């Protein structure tokens, strides 16, 4: 299952992770985000070597701005922070 990440735990969950981390920036009102969600959840279940996280941009607009998210869904792969 994908981990919901907040600003206060982003460093621990993503930046300091020991392996690759896939982050899905999404919003509940976004139709394409809702279509992508089952794929992200399936990926999280099947790929144990990649940590999968989700960031709700309505709840965490600072994270979206920090990483230059201009549209959603946006998926970013972090490696070594």
Say what each PLM segment does:
Residues 1-51, 58-80:
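Proteins that catalyze or organize thiol-disulfide redox chemistry
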């Amino acid at each position: 299952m994908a981990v919901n990440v907040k600003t206060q735990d982003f460093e621990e969950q993503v930046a300091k992770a020991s392996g690759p981390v896939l982050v899905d920036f999404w919003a509940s009102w976004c139709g394409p985000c809702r279509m992508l969600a089952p794929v992200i959840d399936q990926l999280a279940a099947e790929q144990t070597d990649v940590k999968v996280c989700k960031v709700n941009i309505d709840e965490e607009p600072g994270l979206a701005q920090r990483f230059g998210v201009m549209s959603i869904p946006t998926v970013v792969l972090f490696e070594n922070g």
